[in-house]
Amino acid sequence: ALWQFRSMIKCTIPGSDPLLDFNNYGCYCGLGGSGTPVDELDRCCETHDNCYRDAKNLDSCKFLVDNPYTNSYSYSCSNTEITCNSKNNACEAFICNCDRNAAICFSKAPYNKEHKNLDTKKYC
């Protein structure tokens, strides 16, 4: 679920404010996405978007009311390390790994302030 993804980012980047820092960044961070990612961090978001799209197509994730944004899973955080719980069902495990991989990707990618609130109509 999206609120868990925010918590995961705070795990890999302590002191960050995921909603303020990463929402509306580049062409893919935030709602929707199009065009070519502007940098490594934006590529993390594109990959995460694609991962959620793939989750919706999984047999184990036949969403009715649930979707990757609201479907919750179980995970733990220890010293910036995220572990998805082995007790998650197949769908929860998939979404947890989407979020885990993106949070790790975010933590390794440089942050370019000029890509925050980018004019997506012009650059994406």
UniProtKB/Swiss-Prot annotation:
Q: Which Pfam families match?
A: Phospholip_A2_1
Record: active site = H48, D99
Task: Please name the PROSITE patterns in this protein's record.
Answer: PA2_ASP (PS00119), PA2_HIS (PS00118)
Q: Further notes on this entry?
A: This isozyme constitutes about 5% of the pancreatic phospholipase.
Q: How is the cofactor bound?
A: Binds 1 Ca(2+) ion per subunit.
Q: Name its species.
A: Sus scrofa (Pig)
- E.C. designation(s): 3.1.1.4
One of the GO BP terms on file: phosphatidylcholine metabolic process
Q: What subcellular locations does the record give?
A: Secreted
Q: What class of enzyme is it?
A: hydrolase
The record, for CDD domains, names: PLA2c
The name this protein goes by in its record:
Phospholipase A2, minor isoenzyme
